[in-house]
C-alpha cells in the first residue's frame, strides 16, 4: 500500500515533464497511474469480501511510536477504489478541459498530490499518519480551488476552504491525541474493539466534540457548509473530483472509521442525526434557488453529505447499508454531472439553466452521460440512484424511534433532489435553443465526454445488476463500519413496499417541483430557506474574518507603536509575569546562602558596575550614558575574567568595544534627551527592571542547586579534545558539534547585512507632487476597473 500511495506522488513530480513532452495527450498517460492503482486495490476485493483485512507497517519514527502503518478493510477499500477509479477519469478529463492552459503541468502536480493524500488518508492506520494526510488534503485542495489565482473570487474561496477545514483539523488533532491516550494505542485497527472503554471514559465528551468538529468542517455540515459552494470557483475538474468522491467525504470516512469506537451512544446518534438531517433537508431545497449548474450540484453535494452523516448517526444495520450504498451512488452520478457541466460551459460559454436548452444535437455524447447521471441523481429506475434512495427509506422504516420523522425528512429532501436531478440532467438538452450562446455549441473532445459516459453506464449497470456489488464490496464496507458482517441484498424490485410507496410520492412531488421550478426558486419560501441556511453562517464567517483583521490591526497599532522602550518593557514584563508567576504558582524558589570569602576587589568591581548603571539611568547626556553603559559592560567582562572564563571575557571586551564605537558614530544623529520622564513611567521601568533582575538571580540559584544530568556535558568534555582537537569546549561546540547551526546563524547575519547595505545605497526619492499622486491614483483606478471587468 505504501508503494501505491507513493506512486501517485511520483506521478505528480513527473507530470510537468510529461505535459511538456506530450501536451494535451499527457492526461491519457497520467490517467494510467491511478488506473493501475485502482486495479491493485480491486484485486484485493475477493480477500476483503471474505472478511479478511490487510495491515502493513513500516518503521518510521520508532522513538515516537509512530510507524508508517496502513490498514485495508472493506471501508478503506471502498474509498480507495472511488479515489483512484474516479481519479483516473478526472485526470483524463482535465487534459481536455485545460488543454490550452499554460499551467496544465502545475495543475496535474496539485491534482495528483491531492489524490495521493486522499488515498493515504483512507488507508492510514496510525492516527498521526492519518492526520498528516488529512491536513495535506486541505493544503492541496486550497491550491486546487485557488488555481485561477489571478481572480479574486478564486483566492477568496480557497482561503475560506483552508480556514474552515484547517481550523477543524486543529480540533481533530486534539481529539485524536485524546483518543489515542484513552485507548492506549495509536492504531485505528486496534481501537476498533475498544469502544466500550473509550465511551466510558471521562474524556469521551471532549473526544467526541473535537472529532465531530474536524469531520463536520471537512464534510461541510451545518454550520460549516458554506465553504463548499464557494469552492465552485475552482476549475471544473476540481469540483468533479473534490466534491464527488474525495475531499468532502473525508469527514464522513472519519466518522465511519470511528463508528465502532465512538458510535452507538445517545450523544452520537442525536448529534449526527440532528446536524446531518438539518444539513440534508435545508441544502436540498436551497439548491433550487440557483440557476447555475455548478451551484445546484454543490448544494446537492452538501445534501448528500448530510444524509450520509445522518445515516451514520442512526447506526443500524439498515442505515449503514444505505450509507455505503449511497456513497457509491453519489460518487457515480455527481462526478459525471460535474464533468457534464464543464462540457456544457466549454461548448457554449455558459452554465446558466435559464440560457440552456436544445443541446441534444450539438452534444450527443455529453447528453448521454448527463442524462444517465442526472436521472440517477433523481433516483429514476432502473438506475443505481433508485436503489440508493429506497435503501435510505428502508433505514428510516427500520428505526424504532423517530423513524417517521426521519422518513418524512428524507422524502422532503429527495423531492428536491429529484427536481434538481431533472433540471441538470434534462433541461440543458431538451426543448429549443433559448438564445445566442457566446460560442457555437459543439461537442467536447473524447477525453471530456468519456468520463461522464462511463459513470453513467456504471450507474445503469449497478442498477440493473446490483448483485455485482452488494455481496462483495458493499457488504465488506458495511462490515468495516459495524465490525460484524451482515448480508447486503440489493434489488431493483422488492414488490409494493412502504419504501416503494415513499418513492412514488417522491417522484410525484419531484415532478411538480421540476415543472414549477421557475416560480418556486423566487418564492417567499425559498427566500426563507436562503436566509436561514444560505446566508447566515457564511455571513458570520465573512464578518468575523473582516472584524478579526481590523481588531488585529488595532491591537498591532497599539502594541507596535514605534517606541523601542515600550517593546523592551512589554517583553520583560511578560517574562516576569509568565515565568515568575509560574514559579510562584508551582511553589518554586531558591534558598540563598553564601559561605565563601568576599574579596575587596570583587566589592570594588560590583560597586563600579552599579555606579555606571546609575549614571546611565540618571544622566541627560546621551554620550555620558553610552560611556557609563560601556564601563558597566567592561566591569562584567572583568567578572568573567576573575571567575575563570577568559575566552568569554575576551568576547565581552570585543562586543563592548564595537558597541561603543558604533554608538559614538551614530550618536551625532540622535536628538538629545528631553528632560525627565514622569515619575510613574520611571517607577514602572524601575520595578520591571528590578523584578527581572531578581527573577534571573532566582533562576540561576535554582539551576545551581538542581542536580543535572551531566551525560551530555561529560560527552562534550571528553570528545572536544580527543576527536575535535579543541581545548575550548564552547568554541568546539560552536564550530564542530553544532557547526551547521552556526553556519545558519552566520548566513542570517550576512543576509541582514546585505539588506542593510542595499537600503543604505538606495537613492532618496523626492516626495511626489500632488499632480503625480493624482496620476498614480488614476492609473490604479483604471487597473482596478479593468480587473473588475
Question: Residue spans of the language-model regions?
Answer:
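Flexible extramembrane loops and terminal tails that flank transmembrane helices
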Residues: 584, 594-605, 614-617, 669-789
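Membrane-interface and transmembrane segments of multi-pass membrane proteins
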Residues: 439-578, 692-693, 708-720, 766-789
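Short aromatic-rich membrane-water interface segments that cap or initiate transmembrane helices
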Residues: 60-78, 194-208, 397-407, 488-495, ...
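Membrane-interfacial helical/loop segments at transmembrane boundaries in membrane proteins
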Residues: 54-64, 187-196, 389-395, 468-493, ...
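Alpha-helical transmembrane segments and their helix-start/interface "positive-inside/aromatic belt" motifs
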Residues: 23-34, 157-166, 361-370, 442-457, ...
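Transmembrane helix-loop-helix hairpins at membrane boundaries of multipass inner-membrane proteins
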Residues: 2, 13-109, 178-200, 226, ...
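Hydrophobic transmembrane alpha-helices and their helix-loop junctions in integral membrane proteins
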Residues: 89-106, 111-130, 139-444, 581, ...
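Hydrophobic alpha-helical membrane-insertion segments
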Residues: 31-45, 168-177, 371-378, 451-468, ...
Amino acid at each position: 500500500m505504501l508503494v501505491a500511495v507513493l506512486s501517485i506522488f511520483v506521478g505528480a513530480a513527473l507530470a510537468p515533464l510529461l505535459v511538456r513532452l506530450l501536451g494535451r495527450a499527457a492526461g491519457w498517460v497520467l490517467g494510467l497511474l491511478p488506473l493501475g492503482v485502482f486495479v491493485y486495490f480491486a484485486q484485493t476485493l475477493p480477500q476483503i469480501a471474505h472478511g479478511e483485512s490487510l495491515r502493513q507497517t513500516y518503521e518510521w519514527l520508532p522513538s515516537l511510536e509512530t510507524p508508517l502503518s496502513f490498514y485495508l478493510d472493506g471501508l478503506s477499500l471502498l474509498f480507495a477504489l472511488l479515489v483512484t477509479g474516479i481519479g483516473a477519469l478526472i485526470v483524463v478529463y482535465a487534459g481536455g478541459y485545460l488543454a490550452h492552459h499554460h499551467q496544465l503541468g502545475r495543475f496535474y502536480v496539485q491534482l495528483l498530490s491531492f489524490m495521493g493524500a486522499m488515498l493515504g488518508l483512507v488507508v492510514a492506520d496510525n492516527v498521526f499518519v492519518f492526520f498528516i494526510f488529512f491536513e495535506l488534503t486541505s493544503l492541496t485542495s486550497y491550491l486546487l480551488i485557488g488555481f485561477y489565482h489571478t481572480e479574486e473570487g478564486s483566492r477568496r474561496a480557497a482561503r475560506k476552504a483552508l480556514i474552515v477545514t484547517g481550523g477543524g483539523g486543529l480540533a481533530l488533532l486534539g481529539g485524536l491525541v485524546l483518543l489515542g491516550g484513552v485507548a492506549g494505542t495509536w492504531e485505528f485497527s486496534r481501537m476498533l474493539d475498544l469502544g466500550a472503554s473509550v465511551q466510558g471514559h471521562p474524556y469521551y465528551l471532549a473526544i467526541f466534540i473535537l472529532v465531530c468538529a474536524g469531520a463536520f468542517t471537512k464534510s461541510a455540515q451545518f454550520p460549516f457548509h458554506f465553504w463548499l459552494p464557494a469552492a465552485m470557483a475552482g476549475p471544473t475538474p476540481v469540483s468533479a473530483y473534490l466534491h464527488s468522491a474525495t475531499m468532502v467525504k473525508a469527514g464522513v470516512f472519519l466518522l465511519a472509521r470511528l463508528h465502532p469506537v465512538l458510535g452507538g451512544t445517545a450523544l452520537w446518534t442525536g448529534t449526527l442525526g440532528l446536524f446531518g438531517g438539518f444539513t440534508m433537508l435545508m441544502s436540498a431545497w436551497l439548491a433550487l434557488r440557483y440557476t447555475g449548474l455548478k451551484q445546484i450540484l454543490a448544494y446537492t453535494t452538501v445534501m448528500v453529505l448530510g444524509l450520509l452523516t445522518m445515516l451514520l448517526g442512526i447506526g443500524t444495520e439498515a442505515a449503514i447499508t444505505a450509507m455505503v450504498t449511497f456513497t457509491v451512488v453519489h460518487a457515480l452520478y455527481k462526478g459525471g454531472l460535474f464533468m457534464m457541466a464543464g462540457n456544457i460551459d466549454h461548448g457554449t460559454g455558459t452554465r446558466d439553466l435559464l440560457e440552456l436548452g436544445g443541446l441534444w444535437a450539438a452534444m450527443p455524447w455529453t447528453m448521454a452521460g448527463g442524462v444517465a447521471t442526472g436521472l440517477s441523481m433523481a433516483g429514476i429506475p432502473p438506475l443505481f440512484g433508485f436503489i440508493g434512495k429506497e435503501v435510505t427509506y428502508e433505514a428510516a422504516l427500520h428505526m424504532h424511534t423517530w423513524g417517521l420523522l426521519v422518513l418524512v425528512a428524507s422524502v422532503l429532501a429527495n423531492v428536491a433532489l429529484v427536481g434538481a436531478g431533472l433540471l441538470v440532467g434534462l433541461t440543458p438538452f431538451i426543448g429549443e435553443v433559448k438564445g445566442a450562446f457566446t460560442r457555437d455549441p459543439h461537442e467536447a473532445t473524447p477525453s471530456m465526454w468519456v468520463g461522464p459516459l462511463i459513470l453513467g453506464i456504471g450507474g445503469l449497470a449497478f442498477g440493473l445488476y446490483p448483485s455485482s456489488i452488494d455481496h462483495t464490496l458493499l457488504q465488506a464496507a458495511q462490515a468495516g463500519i459495524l465490525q460484524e458482517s451482515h448480508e447486503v441484498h440489493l434489488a431493483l424490485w422488492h414488490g409494493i413496499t412502504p419504501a416503494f410507496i415513499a418513492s412514488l410520492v417522491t417522484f410525484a412531488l419531484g415532478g411538480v417541483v421540476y415543472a414549477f421550478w421557475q416560480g418556486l426558486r423566487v418564492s417567499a419560501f425559498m427566500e426563507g430557506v436562503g436566509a436561514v441556511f444560505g446566508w447566515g453562517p457564511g455571513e458570520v464567517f465573512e464578518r468575523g474574518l473582516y472584524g478579526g483583521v481590523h481588531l488585529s490591526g488595532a491591537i498591532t497599532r497599539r502594541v507596535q507603536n514605534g517606541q523601542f522602550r515600550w517593546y523592551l518593557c512589554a517583553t520583560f514584563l511578560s517574562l516576569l509575569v509568565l515565568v515568575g508567576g509560574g514559579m510562584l504558582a508551582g511553589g518554586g524558589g531558591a534558598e540563598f546562602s553564601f559561605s565563601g570569602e568576599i574579596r575587596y576587589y570583587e566589592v570594588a568591581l560590583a560597586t563600579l558596575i552599579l555606579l555606571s548603571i546609575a549614571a546611565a539611568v540618571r544622566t541627560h547626556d546621551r554620550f555620558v550614558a553610552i560611556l557609563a553603559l560601556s564601563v558597566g559592560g567592561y566591569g562584567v567582562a572583568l567578572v568573567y575574567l576573575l571567575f575563570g572564563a577568559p575566552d568569554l571575557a575576551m568576547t565581552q571586551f570585543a562586543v563592548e568595544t564595537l558597541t561603543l564605537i558604533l554608538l559614538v558614530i551614530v550618536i551625532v544623529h540622535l536628538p538629545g534627551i528631553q528632560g525627565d520622564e514622569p515619575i510613574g513611567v520611571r517607577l514602572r521601568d524601575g520595578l520591571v527592571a528590578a523584578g527581572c533582575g531578581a527573577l534571573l538571580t532566582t533562576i540561576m540559584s535554582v539551576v545551581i542547586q538542581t542536580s543535572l544530568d551531566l551525560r551530555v556535558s561529560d560527552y562534550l568534555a571528553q570528545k572536544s579534545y580527543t576527536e575535535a582537537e579543541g581545548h575550548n569546549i564552547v568554541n568546539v561546540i560552536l564550530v564542530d558539534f553544532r557547526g551547521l547551526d552556526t553556519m545558519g546563524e552566520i548566513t542570517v547575519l550576512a543576509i541582514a547585512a546585505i539588506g542593510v547595505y542595499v537600503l543604505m545605497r538606495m537613492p532618496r526619492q523626492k516626495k511626489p507632487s500632488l499632480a503625480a499622486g493624482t496620476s498614480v491614483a488614476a492609473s490604479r483606478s483604471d487597473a482596478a476597473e479593468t480587473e473588475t471587468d
